[in-house]
Regions:
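Active-site acidic/histidine clusters and adjacent loop/turn architecture
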Residues: 40-118
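Loop-rich catalytic cores of soluble enzymes, especially ATP-dependent carboxylate-amine ligases
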Residues: 106, 117-133, 140, 149-163
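Long, contiguous juxta-domain segments that are non-catalytic but functionally important
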Residues: 1-48
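A generic structural motif
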Residues: 29-33, 68-77, 150-154
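Short, solvent-exposed loop/turn segments at the edges of secondary structure
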Residues: 22, 59, 139-143
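Short, charge-rich binding segments
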Residues: 89-92, 135-139
Length: 163
């Protein structure tokens, strides 16, 4: 397959507009002093990472990951993200959700930063490997990921045309 040409044609624009987007928003939970919260994710009533499909943890147990379902509408996506944020803020009533990507304070004792509590040993070992390779500090950097799903009908059509 030659990928040196445009994947889509002008007539594909309407099918492309029927693609969906999901968001994963990572944020640290902090206490009233601005330090990383010492409350576990379970403290908020969410159980382990696999318990709630939309409110999870990323690298650290204190690092929320709010995951929206795929949506074709910016308004729907925004409503999901706002609702997930509100639920999280309410569930962890003694914590605040840090708004910035970079952590405000990192404890001198890095052992206070707990890796997310995961049932799958492979996922936990991957995070432990990240600690060994990069350290915990860099793993606390939080951000937003956009997940784009191209309209499956269009992808199927294009793949069929490529043979």
């Amino acid at each position: 397959m030659d990928l040196s040409y445009f994947w889509f044609e002008e007539e594909d624009i309407f099918d492309l507009l029927n693609s969906t987007v999901g968001i994963e928003k990572e944020s640290l939970r902090i206490d009233q002093d601005g330090s990383l919260s010492q409350h576990s994710h379970k403290h908020g009533g969410f159980g382990n990472r696999s318990f709630h499909p939309y409110i999870q943890t990323d690298f650290a147990d204190v690092q929320l990951e709010l995951v929206t379902p795929p949506s074709a509408s910016a308004d729907e996506l925004s409503a999901w993200l706002q609702a997930l944020h509100q639920i999280s803020a309410t569930a962890f009533e003694d914590d605040f959700i840090w708004p910035s990507s970079m952590p405000g304070q990192i404890p001198d004792d890095r052992d206070q930063i707990k890796i997310a509590q995961l049932e799958d040993p492979i996922e936990y070992n991957y995070r432990a490997h990240l600690v060994d390779t990069y350290g915990k500090d860099v793993q606390l950097i939080s951000g937003i990921h956009f997940n784009l799903e191209l309209n499956p009908k269009l992808v199927k059509s294009r793949c069929a045309s490529w043979g």
